[in-house]
Amino acid sequence: MKHLKTLLLPAIAAVAPFMISSCDPKPAKGTLLDNVPNILTNVVGDSILQTWVKDSISVTSDFGHVGIAMQHPVDTFSVTSQAITEYMSEMLGGKYDGSYTSPKAVMKYYHADLMSELKTEYEEVKRARGDDEVKMEWDVTFSKVADNSKFFTYKYTMYNYLGGAHGMSALLGVTFRKSDMRRMGWEIVRNYANDPFQELMRKGLREYFEVKSDDELKNMFLNPDHIYSLPLPECPPLFTDHGIMFVYNPYEIGPYAAGMPTFTIPYADIQPYLTTTAQKLIEKQ
């Protein structure tokens, strides 16, 4: 169980204890894996074609199910492919010490590791309950969000069930600058605590929760005082085709029943609050 807990998304470890006992209904079987297209072709850089494919491993045994799906470039020796394969390894525990030129090999390594850990957890739960009815599940998907000549954005979605009353789901992601594969974090936002920027965030959340006033919005928060100073999400900023996406995982600002509060601030609105580094990434976006 100790190793499995290390995989509950390092960036949201602070809220993981609450999320494990959440009331989120289990998604339809295979949702995370089946929604990943098999082949994607994009024009990147100066009309350079780059084709992405899907690899997946999905095994159901007597103790449960483990699935890993990943989109990556066909050219697995490319800088892009190696960067996202390394990211996948980090999100799944960071123990793989081989080459990142084979996404499939990394997937197989962590799939076998998860199967072993899940079997151990299953045996512990079975002994505690005195029956073998419980079935474990762990599904993760790595997929592309956006891709252009300056950056690409990659996300990690996860659902697991470890024998408790309910399952757990979460989402993380990262935007890479293509020139050097730098990962963008919230350091690219200036003066986020100032009210003009806070209002952009409140506006996005009002739309997500479908409320019209801040008085209504604060009732959606676990801490009503967040209406005065919203924290930035644990999920890094996700650069998309049209703006920067903000994703709050369960229990960051709202109850689990609120889902994952998500909104996108258009580049035209957020640009004044971005560092020069980020502004250069979104030129002509």
Regions found by a protein language model. Give the residues of each.
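Compositionally biased intrinsically disordered regions enriched in Thr/Gly
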Residues: C23-Q285
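Bacterial N-terminal signal peptides that target proteins for export
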Residues: K2-L9
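C-terminal motif of bacterial Sec signal peptides marking the signal peptidase cleavage site
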Residues: F18-S22
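Hydrophobic helical h-region of N-terminal Sec-dependent signal peptides
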Residues: L9-P17
